Structure formats: structure tokens, C-alpha cells
Amino acid sequence: MHEMSVALAVIDQVEQAAQQAGDVTAVRSVRLQVGELAGVVPDSLSFCFELACAGTVLEGADLVTEEVPGRARCAPCAREWSVGMPPRLSCPECGGARVDLLSGRELQIVSVHWEDGRTHAQTREPISEER
């Protein structure tokens, strides 16, 4: 299950950040951007996250996922569109196949909420191998 490896990577990054902060006793929530084209099922990720958090500083933490829609731009005519699922990667205007993906592959931690109430923005690179 791909989502389990993603959940473990998120937990590892948050645990490292918590260790660097020094005084964190519990993590309350993790906010994660998940692109529509990232190949991750948010419900499966939440399930895996809950299981993998057991016995860590993240035990009981909420995983809040924000879906980022897939968008593309046609190189020849500059038309932008939502690619949807399954992705439509040919231009609806001119039929061109030279497109740039503008969004939808994101898989990154946006913020972490510690028990002390402070919110810390992500300072690390996205965990996704799909850039």
C-alpha cells in the first residue's frame, strides 16, 4: 500500500521537526496538501496515518488533507484547464499535446500543530517524488 509509505514519511518528518523544537510532547494535527494527480487516496492515507502514529508523539493527531486540483496549460495556445481524473492531457481548445502541468502533483506538509498551540510552517522539501 503506497499510502502507508507516504504516512510513514510524513510521521518521520514531523518527528524530526518535533525533536528539533525540543519541548514538544504531542502533535495535535498535521495539514497536508495532496494533489489530485499525486496517486494518493486521501481516505487510505488517513487510515494508514492513524495506524502508523501509534506509539509516537503523533498518536491521536488529526491528518487534515487539502486536495489540490490538477491544472494544465497548453504550450501552443496558452489555454488553461482542469485535467480531472482520469487526467485529460490534450488541450480542449486546439487539441495540442504539448502541455505543462501547473498543479496537482503536490504532496507536502503545510503545517503542524504542536500541543503548545503554536503552528509551525513546513521548512522541508515535499515528500513526493513526483515533482
Curated annotation (Swiss-Prot):
It comes from the Bacteria. Transmembrane segments: none annotated. GO terms for biological process: protein maturation; protein modification process. The keyword 4Fe-4S does not apply. GO terms for molecular function: nickel cation binding; zinc ion binding. Zn(2+) binds at C74, C77, C91, C94. Keywords: Metal-binding, Nickel, Zinc. Ni(2+) binds at H2. The keyword Transmembrane helix does not apply. HAMAP family: HypA_HybF. NCBIfam families: hypA (TIGR00100). Belongs to the HypA/HybF family. Involved in the maturation of [NiFe] hydrogenases. Required for nickel insertion into the metal center of the hydrogenase. PANTHER family: HYDROGENASE MATURATION FACTOR HYPA (PTHR34535:SF3). This is Hydrogenase maturation factor HypA.
